[in-house]
UniProtKB/Swiss-Prot annotation:
Keywords: DNA recombination, DNA-binding, Plasmid, Transposable element, Transposition. PANTHER family: TRANSPOSASE RV3428C-RELATED (PTHR35004:SF8). InterPro entries: ArsR-like_HTH, Homeodomain-like_sf, HTH_IS408/IS1162_type, Integrase_cat-core, IstA-like_C, RNA_pol_sigma70_r4_t2, RNaseH-like_sf, RNaseH_sf. The keyword DNA-binding applies. Residues 138-319 form the Integrase catalytic domain. It comes from Sinorhizobium fredii (strain NBRC 101917 / NGR234). It holds the Pfam family Mu-transpos_C_2. Residues 15-96 form the HTH IS408-type domain. This is Putative transposase y4bL/y4kJ/y4tB. Gene3D superfamilies: Homeodomain-like, Ribonuclease H-like superfamily/Ribonuclease H. The lineage of its organism: Bacteria, Pseudomonadati, Pseudomonadota, Alphaproteobacteria, Hyphomicrobiales. Belongs to the transposase IS21/IS408/IS1162 family. One of its GO terms (molecular function) is sigma factor activity. One of its GO terms (biological process) is DNA integration. Residues 493-516 are annotated as: Disordered.
Amino acid sequence: MPRRKQARRTTVRDIRTILRLTHEEGLSVREIAERLKIGKSSVSTYLLRSREAGLSWPLPIGADEDAKLERRLFGRAGRPPRDLSEPDWALVVRELKRKGVTLTLLWQEYRASHPDGYGFTWFCEQVAAFRQRTSVAFRNRHAAGAVMQTDYAGPTVPVIDPATGVIHPAQIFVAVLGASNLTFAHASFSQQLPDWIDGQVRALTFYGGVTKAIVCDNLKSGVAKALWFEPTLTATFAAMAEHYDTTILPTRSRKPRDKGRVEGAVLIVERWILARLRNRTFFSLAALNTAIAELLEDLNNRTMRHVGKSRRELFEEIERPALKPLPAIPFEYAEWKSAKVHPDYHVEVDKTFYSVPHRLIGCTLQVRLTHRVVEIFHDHQRVASHVRRSQRSGHVTVNDHMPKAHQRYANTTPANLIGRATQIGPNAAILVERMMRDRPHPEQGYRSAMGILSLAPRYGSQRLEAACERALTINAITYSSVASILKSGLDRERPQAEHAAPTPAHTNIRGRSYYQ
C-alpha cells in the first residue's frame, strides 16, 4: 500500500494568499486548495479564523506584517492579551557594544520588564533583522574602546608660503573610533614617521583615552615588515605603542575591508570637510587645522540618520567609559639608531660623541634621540643619558663612565695640582705652577706636574720640597731634573750661588739711556 504523501506546512504567506484569492479573484475553497497544494479543510479553517478576527481584504494597517497577522488569527480565546511591546532595537544594538553585554542579558532585562513578552529566539531574530536593515551603520561592529582606525585621505589641501608663494600640499590624517564613529582629522606636510606619530598622538589626546588596539595602514614610515601574522614595526612606532599600552594592527595591502571604518570616515571627511574648504586659501598649517577643527565639531555633533544619535553622543554614552586613561606624559617623538661603542667608550650619534660605561666597549647599543635628550640602551636597559648638543661635533663625557685611571686624569685642573703642591711646600707649588705656565697649553704640563707630586710618597714631602727649591735655583723646571736631584741626594746639600761672569765689552751694548 503506497504511503500517503505528507502535506506541506502552511505559512503566513499562504494565509495572505488565501485571503487575496478569496476576496479579489473569488475562487472557491477547492480551487484555492488545488492552486496552493494544501488541504481544503486548512483553507476553510483559515477563512473561518479571518472572519472571526474581523479581517478583510486588503488587510488593515497593523495586520499586514506576518507576526501581527499570525497573532490576530491564532490568539487563544479567553486568554488575556500578551504584552508584546517591542524593544528599542537601536538601543539594543548600542548596548551590545558595551563590554560584557550579551543578547541573553538584554533579553532577560526585556522579559523582566515585559514578563509576557517575546521569546529569546524571536528576540535574536529581530536583532539580526535590525542590523541587516541598518547594515551601513553597523557593517563592522566593534566593542566600545576596542579599536581606533587611522589612515590618510587621498586629496590634499594647498597651503601657500606667504614669503615665497610656494604651494605645499597638506596631507590629511584621519582617525575614527570603532564603536561610536567619533572622527578626528589633522593636517600635516608629510606622511613621514614624525608626522605619522604626531597624528596618532593627537588623535588619542583628542579622544581623551586609549583603545586596546590601533588599526592602521602599513605605511613604510611605521611598519618595517608588513607581514599579516607577525608585522614588524619601526622602533619609534613600537615605542609609541608601548608608551600608550596598546597594540598596533597593520592591515593587509589592497584590503580596504581590514579598516573599513576609517575608509568610511575618510570619505566623510573628504565630503563634509575638505569639500567645504575647496574655495578657501590657507597661508599656514595652523590656519588650516583651525578650519578643520571647526567643521569636525559640526560633523561629530550631527545626528546619524540610521542611529538617531550623533557621534559625540554615542562616544560619551558607550565609548569614553571603555577607553584606557592616557599616560601622564604624552609620547615624545624620538629617532632610534644603532651605534657601536668605540675604544674610547663613546658612541657616535649625529656627528657627536657621547660616552657610555667603559665596560661596554665593542658592544652595539640602541640610541634614542629626541630634540632634547640622547638616551643609550643595552639589552633594553638605559646605560647613559645626555643632553643633546645643538652643535654637531665634539665629545660629551660623564666621568663615571671612565676607568678609574682616566677619572683621576679627567679631574685634574691647574688649581687642583697647585693646591696639592702647596701642601708639600711653597717651592713645590711654584715649580708646578711654572710647569703649566711655561707650556703653550696648561694641559701639556699636567703629566709633569702629576709626576712631581707622585715623588712625595717615595721621598717624603720635606725632601721633595728641598729638591724643588734646588731645581728652581738652577732653573731646571722639569720632572726628570727633580727626580735626578732626589736620586743623587743633592736635595740634602745647600745649593751654591753661581756668580755670573761679566759681559764682555762689544759694540752692541746699549746704555741705560736706550730704555728711557
